[in-house]
Amino acid sequence: MEPGGDGAEDDVGAGIGPPAPGWCLRGRCRVGSQREDVGWWRSWLQQSYQAVKEKSSEALEFMKRDLTEFTQVVQRDTACTIAATASVVKEKLTTEGSSGATEKMKKGLSDFLGVISDTFAPSPDKTIDCDVITLMGTPSGTAEPYDGTKARLYSLQSDPATYCNEPDGPPELFDAWLSQFCLEEKKGEISELLVGSPSIRALYTKMVPAAVSHSEFWHRYFYKVHQLEQEQARRDALKQRAEQSISEEPGWEEEEEELAGVSPTSLKEAKVPVARPSTSPEGGPGPQSPCEENLVTPVEPPTEVTPSESSESVSLVTQIAKPPPASEAPALPKDLSQKLLEASLEEQDLAVDTGETGPPPRAQSKPHTPACRPSGPEPRPPARVETLREEILTDLRVFELNSDSGKSTPSNNGKKGSSTDISEDWEKDFDLDMTEEEVQMALSKVDASGELEDVEWEDWD
């Protein structure tokens, strides 16, 4: 049995022994490639699982966050709705009056709803309207309502340039401020800043004494604070000035009322009338009677002209725009006044010869006082025309001599030679040759007709 057994074992060992060289190499290559494929698939599966796990965890976190926010919103809205409903019901129950058991029941229900309202709805003093109040973080880690001045102060405290750089502005201002500043008086404030402001404490620990000294650190800080206070004071002053300018409305209406109160009549009354001297210029004929003096006085408006004035005198007075002072009026030459007298005499003689019955033309009306009667053989109208032209020669624009027959002379433009042209035109139109006797007769007829005319004018008045 043993030999047989040994033989069997030998056969098995012979069967298990190393195979041929070519077959053994191919088997090992196959096993190695299979192992590599299994390792790659395993790593790919692990990576895919890890990626899916990470994405799933992120999605789960987002879902949890959304659900949490949704739950909070629903709870808050529900609490607000319940509180509002309870408040409304409570108000209605308190306003409606009742008696007996109904009143007790309503009172208990009102108390219960009041407890619910106070539980779910916070009091108004504990709520913050985010649309109105803006919060800002302080260096100590707390939050407080936003203030521009405090925000700039916090920014200044946390800026390293505040302590490292030289102060802004002229050095003279810094020296003047430094001469009045005492660092010993700020010890308490420095201690509070180091305790209450982490940013200042960190910068102080980092810079002092490595970069700057203790005194330079605090001198620059307090000077920056001083400049900030000055800037804020200027802003407040500008703001106050702008508010005052907006609040003060312009008084345009008051100015218009004041201007409307000044009437044209008051302006006229304010004008000072120009006084005319009673004496006539040298070389010119002066007034011969009180009537002639009245002719050179300031003329009243046309509505107050008496009927005794002729159309010629009215047109002459109304055509004067600005009568100059008597001192500026040049003296009328004697030859010019003589020619005017001759022209008026020729016109009167023509009216007498043609048999006209109307009143002779006159330059000015005759006053009705006895002192105004003509004292000589010469007619009064030429003398009055001569006196009036002497006073208003410079401002006269149009001077017309109108006859009763309807004929008029060319216009006078205010020049001295114009009256000479008038007399020459009259001589050319009529071409009259009169002797001295005819002139005397014409003058006597003119005096007679003048007296009749005065009577007629008095009757007409």
Swiss-Prot record:
One of its GO terms (cellular component) is cytoplasm. Residues 250-259 have a biased composition (Acidic residues). Residues 239-384, 398-430 are annotated as: Disordered. Disulfide bonds: none annotated. The modification Phosphothreonine is found at residue 387. Residues 402-421 have a biased composition (Polar residues). The keyword Phosphoprotein applies. The modification Phosphoserine is found at residues 123, 197, 418-419, 449. SMART domains: BSD (SM00751). Keywords: Phosphoprotein. PANTHER family: BSD DOMAIN-CONTAINING PROTEIN 1 (PTHR16019:SF5), SYNAPSE-ASSOCIATED PROTEIN (PTHR16019). This is BSD domain-containing protein 1. It comes from Bos taurus (Bovine). The gene is BSDC1.
